[in-house]
């Protein structure tokens, strides 16, 4: 028994000694792993085409961090196995089944995925290249890629995964395959495409949200150039701008909504014609804002006895101009469909502004003669109208005095929807803010655009908070809430009343965009800090290359 315990103790000691652990004592290791060899000759040329694996040796134990996201092989090879997968090792190994192309330089870009086992020190931007020919191609393209609209995150609020690729120019371009050469931009947007062979290429950059190394048309933001690149010598300083992708118009779904059903589309159609198919509903109204993704079909389910006891199959036809179809929904009337009015805006009125309130239904009639506006218990004259831009909103105008508090009483049944649905009584309390609580901003545009443009003040999420549609050189924003803003101009080059983004499918570039950025500013856009009672004046020269996108 004692002999057995002795052997067990020795075995445990040997296992413990064989483990890879952190060194005891001394300073923290900050040195990344170092490559010491590979299974390919040091010249890395004339590599056999039937080679099926790459092995790279290092001077210390390593592990691979997010290797499936970081590893990019150009031209693409479909690999089958990567070592180490999780445990540490002193080498990495990639295996594949493909036969290598003749006279081709292959580049394995590992990004920052190779890290030492103990401290996770990355071997930065590690590349390994070899050639099946008698030389390694050494041309490169380097540059930066950035968001044309100044957005630092993607549409879902996540960090971008920016990929840049080159396609060989052919009679038929297939962008549904991986690019022939591909790389990823670093967090600052800098990229390098290395070990390139001379030839003609089309370049593309995109936010690879699903990590498939292929641009998904209509789903991912994209940057491209219309002209081909005739690569005879290396190119540096290329600038790519990434734009929201134009989506093809496509029906998505129909859902039950307060007062009817809501039909949604991809691609923001200009116009959608919707008609009921069948007897129900017989009385309905369709609302759709130009280039909105939503179409609301309003009807009185209770009045027409639609889906009251059991669900009913309702059918509607739609016509977007490019597609027509008939769709259906099993409709069950919601238990509660009351019409409500509320103030989703602000209880504080900026100087010179009107009071607004909104309803969850479209409004067809109001009876303001029955309403009451008071300040300090004294009635005050006012006018009210349904908004021409949004029929769910009401605008109330009066001589609002700064610093005073107001009370607007809207009795029951004085806000009416198109099929006689009536609102409940409601009271709004609000205050006319003082001018000294706000600031102002004036910008003088040097070499302004020839066409009309939207000039916008954006919040930290790059959402427009204030904007003007103009063609003037001197633009003034007054009564701005104190905050940090960014300044952007969108140009209506085609004079259609909308700003149009790039369309990769037709190789149509976006309309012009200008981002306000002072020389030397490290941020994408210069911040404008608005303070109470402060007036800021700036000159903005739109001819500077750093500010113009196209």
Where are these regions (language model features)?
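Long, low-complexity intrinsically disordered regulatory regions
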Residues: 239-243, 540
